[in-house]
C-alpha cells in the first residue's frame, strides 16, 4: 500500500469530528500495514440510515486503500441496548428480533462497504460461552465511578432516573469485542466516545496495543433539530425507494444542505465552498442544490439511472402536481369500502393510526384530488388516495 499523505489527510479531516490519537493513526496508515478497522452495530432496528452512512463511508475510503473492515454484529449487546445518549433505559430485544434485524442490516451495510474486504463477526462467538466468572473478571477491571463519568449516566443519576446493571456492562462488552478481534482502529459517532475509549483501556490492560479511535459527527435529521433517528421519523433510509429518498432530501432545511454534502457525498471541498458562497449571496436556489444532493446520494446507493428517474418523478408529481402512473395499488378487504384511516394504514401510506390522523388534521390527505378532513370518509374501488406531498395509492 503506497498512499500519499494528502489522501490520508483528506480522509482524517473531512467528515471527522475527532481522532484519538491522530498522529499515531496517521503513522499506522503510512506504515503500509493492513489495518483492522472495527465497526460495531447493534441490530436493534433493521434499517441503516444516512446517520450510519457517515462512518460507513470512512470505512469504505480506507478499504479502498487496502485495509480490512471487521464488522461486529452485536447480537448480545443489542439485547441490552446501547445507552449512549439515552435518557431512559432501553427495552431488551429477543434473540429472534435481533437475528431478523441483523439479516436486513447486513444487506444494507454492503450497499456502502465492500463485502469482499469485510470480516463479519458475531458477538455470540465469544459471549455464547461466557460464564459468570468471566463477567465478574471483566467487570472487575472497571469501577462504578468510571461508568458514572459518562455524561448520559451522570444526568440520569442526578435526575434519579434508573440505570440498569446491564447498561453499566455495555461499554465493557463493547470494549471486549475490540480485544477479541484485535482492533487497530474503532469507528463511531461522537456520542460513542466513552465506549470507544474504554476499548483502548481494556486492550492496554490485556497487553494489546490500544486501538485508535475515529469519531464522526452526529448527522442532524430531516427535521433540522434532532439526531437522525428512525424512532423520531426524521431519517433517510439507505434502502428506501429512490423516489422516497429523493423526496426526503428535498424536505431538509436549507441550513443542512452543506453538512449533508460534506458528510455523505464525494463532492469536492472547493465545490461545497462555492455552494456556500452562492447561498450566502442568494445566487442559487436551494432547491437546485437539494436536487444535486439527492442525485449524488442515489447514484451512490443505486445508480445514475435511478437518480434521473427519481428526479423526473419529483418534477412531475410534486412540482407539477401530476398523478403518477406507477403508483402502488392496495386491495380492499373483501372488495368492501373501508374508512380512509384504515386504508392509509393498509396501503402503507402511514404506519399508525396516530400518523394517519395527523395527516388528516394537517390537510395532507386527498381522495381523487379532493382534500379530506373527516376520518370516517369511505374509500371505494378505483379511488386514488394521496397522503403527504408525494405518496399515492390506488384502491382496487
Swiss-Prot record:
GO terms for biological process: tyrosyl-tRNA aminoacylation. The keyword Aminoacyl-tRNA synthetase applies. Coiled coil: none annotated. Its EC number is 6.1.1.1. A motif ('HIGH' region) lies at residues 43-52. It is found in: Cytoplasm. Residues 338-396 form the S4 RNA-binding domain. Keywords: Aminoacyl-tRNA synthetase, ATP-binding, Cytoplasm, Ligase, Nucleotide-binding, Protein biosynthesis, RNA-binding. ATP binds at residue 230. GO terms for cellular component: cytosol. Disulfide bonds: none annotated. Its main location: cytoplasm. It holds the Pfam family SYY_C-terminal. It catalyses: tRNA(Tyr) + L-tyrosine + ATP = L-tyrosyl-tRNA(Tyr) + AMP + diphosphate + H(+). CDD domains: S4, TyrRS_core. PROSITE patterns: AA_TRNA_LIGASE_I, S4. A motif ('KMSKS' region) lies at residues 227-231. One of its GO terms (molecular function) is RNA binding. The keyword Protein biosynthesis applies. Belongs to the class-I aminoacyl-tRNA synthetase family. TyrS type 2 subfamily. Catalyzes the attachment of tyrosine to tRNA(Tyr) in a two-step reaction: tyrosine is first activated by ATP to form Tyr-AMP and then transferred to the acceptor end of tRNA(Tyr). Homodimer. This is Tyrosine--tRNA ligase. It comes from Dehalococcoides mccartyi (strain CBDB1). The gene is tyrS.
Amino acid at each position: 500500500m503506497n498512499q500519499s499523505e494528502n489522501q490520508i489527510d483528506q480522509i482524517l479531516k473531512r467528515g471527522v469530528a475527532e481522532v484519538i490519537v491522530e498522529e499515531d493513526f496517521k503513522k499506522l496508515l503510512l506504515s503500509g500495514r493492513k489495518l483492522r478497522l472495527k465497526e460495531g452495530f447493534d441490530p436493534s432496528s433493521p434499517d441503516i440510515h444516512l446517520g450510519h452512512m457517515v462512518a460507513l463511508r470512512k470505512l469504505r475510503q480506507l478499504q479502498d486503500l487496502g485495509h480490512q473492515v471487521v464488522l461486529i454484529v452485536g447480537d448480545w449487546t443489542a439485547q441490552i441496548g446501547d445507552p449512549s445518549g439515552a435518557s431512559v433505559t432501553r427495552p431488551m430485544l429477543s434473540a429472534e428480533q435481533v437475528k431478523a434485524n441483523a439479516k436486513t442490516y447486513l444487506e444494507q451495510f454492503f450497499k456502502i462497504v465492500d463485502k469482499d474486504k469485510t470480516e463479519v463477526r458475531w458477538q455470540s462467538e465469544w459471549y455464547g460461552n461466557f460464564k459468570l466468572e468471566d463477567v465478574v473478571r471483566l467487570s472487575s477491571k472497571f469501577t462504578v465511578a468510571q461508568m458514572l463519568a459518562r455524561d448520559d449516566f451522570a444526568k440520569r443519576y442526578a435526575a434519579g432516573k434508573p440505570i440498569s446493571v446491564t447498561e453499566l456492562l455495555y461499554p465493557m462488552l463493547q470494549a471486549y469485542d475490540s480485544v477479541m478481534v484485535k482492533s487497530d482502529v474503532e469507528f463511531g459517532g461522537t456520542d460513542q466516545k466513552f465506549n470507544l475509549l474504554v476499548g483502548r483501556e481494556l486492550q492496554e490492560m490485556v497487553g494489546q496495543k490500544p486501538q485508535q479511535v475515529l469519531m464522526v459527527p452526529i448527522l442532524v435529521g430531516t427535521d433540522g433539530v434532532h439526531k437522525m433517528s428512525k424512532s423520531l421519523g426524521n431519517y433517510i433510509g439507505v434502502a428506501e425507494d429512490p423516489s422516497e429518498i429523493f423526496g426526503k432530501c428535498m424536505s431538509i432545511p436549507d441550513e443542512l444542505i452543506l453538512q449533508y454534502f460534506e458528510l455523505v457525498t464525494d463532492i469536492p471541498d472547493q465545490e461545497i465552498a462555492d455552494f456556500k458562497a452562492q447561498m450566502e449571496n442568494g445566487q442559487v436556489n436551494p432547491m437546485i442544490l437539494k436536487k444535486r444532493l439527492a442525485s449524488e446520494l442515489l447514484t451512490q446507493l443505486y445508480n445514475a439511472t435511478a437518480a434521473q428517474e427519481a428526479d423526473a418523478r419529483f418534477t412531475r408529481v410534486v412540482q407539477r402536481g401530476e398523478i403518477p402512473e406507477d403508483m402502488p395499488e392496495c386491495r380492499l378487504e373483501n372488495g368492501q369500502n373501508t374508512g380512509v384511516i384504515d386504508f392509509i394504514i393498509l396501503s402503507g401510506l402511514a404506519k399508525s393510526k396516530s400518523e394517519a390522523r395527523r395527516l388528516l388534521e394537517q390537510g395532507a390527505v386527498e381522495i381523487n384530488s379532493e382534500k379530506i378532513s373527516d376520518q370516517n370518509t369511505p374509500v371505494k374501488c378505483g379511488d386514488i388516495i394521496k397522503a403527504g406531498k408525494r405518496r399515492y395509492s390506488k384502491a382496487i
